[in-house]
């Protein structure tokens, strides 16, 4: 049985996505009332944010926070099992928005999850490639950048890990990024410098959807990132794309995905 690494807080609600605006705001219909939630995902969330789609929101732990909800999960790929429990969502023709037939699933879109997930999974000893490391520092500055994870151990070089959230899948291939990412490109360049200095560097891709069977960079979306991805891999940067199992209770670590060839 897989161990749950991250649990969602009590008080989560499921509603219907209405719209996204000003990049960080989403409107969601919950119990017949439209609420405003925060999304920290700066990507496009390509193919996910369709009007009427079920979404899961988590409540703010700080009662004084301006926006009391955070977008955590988006349903995709098929009919939601408790469709009749959600508020009806009229479409432009006046009917109710239909959903795809087939088996649907949740997609995790909270971009704060990957580095938190990595730290907890590391502390639980779930990554064979981190054997020999005992200390996990987060948000460590190096050069002009700040990387998610820096691992330390006795007699081993430091291991720097940058964590990325993956929500895009095409033809069973999980792809990153889902929009041009200059920040992601900068991180790859920083990882290359780390390798050149004699330390270890890796990327942890948190694939938060079940239909990704392989992993690769999104060449059609960000060719610069893709070129740098293959360059740093050849240089020695380690690539670890992991499938993350998702339920409305929480997240657990699945298998590592095969990497497509260049």
UniProtKB/Swiss-Prot annotation:
It comes from the Bacteria. InterPro entries: SfsA, SfsA_C, SfsA_N. GO terms for molecular function: DNA binding. Belongs to the SfsA family. PANTHER family: SUGAR FERMENTATION STIMULATION PROTEIN A. This is Sugar fermentation stimulation protein homolog. The gene is sfsA.
């Amino acid at each position: 049985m897989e161990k749950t690494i991250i649990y969602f807080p009590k008080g989560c609600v499921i509603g219907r996505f209405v719209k996204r605006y000003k990049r960080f705001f989403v409107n969601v219909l919950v119990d017949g009332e439209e609420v405003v939630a925060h999304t920290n995902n700066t990507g496009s969330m390509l193919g996910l944010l369709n009007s009427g789609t079920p979404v899961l929101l988590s409540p703010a732990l700080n009662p004084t926070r301006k926006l009391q909800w955070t977008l955590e999960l988006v349903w995709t790929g098929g009919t939601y099992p408790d469709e009749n429990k959600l508020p009806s969502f009229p479409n432009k023709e006046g009917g109710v928005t239909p959903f795809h037939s087939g088996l649907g699933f949740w997609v995790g879109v909270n971009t704060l999850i990957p580095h938190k997930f990595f730290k907890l999974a590391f502390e639980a000893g779930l990554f064979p490639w981190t054997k020999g490391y005992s200390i996990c520092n987060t948000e460590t500055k190096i050069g002009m950048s700040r990387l998610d994870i820096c691992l330390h151990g006795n007699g081993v070089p430091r291991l720097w890990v940058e964590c990325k959230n993956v929500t895009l899948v095409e033809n069973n291939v999980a792809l990153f990024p889902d929009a041009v990412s200059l920040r992601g490109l900068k991180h790859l360049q920083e990882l290359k410098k780390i390798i050149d200095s004699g330390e270890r560097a890796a990327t942890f891709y948190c694939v938060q959807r079940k239909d990704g069977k392989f992993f690769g960079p999104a060449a059609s979306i960000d060719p610069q990132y893709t070129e740098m991805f293959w360059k740093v891999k050849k240089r020695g940067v380690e690539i670890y794309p992991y499938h993350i199992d998702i339920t409305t209770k929480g997240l657990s670590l699945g298998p590592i995905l095969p990497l497509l060839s260049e």
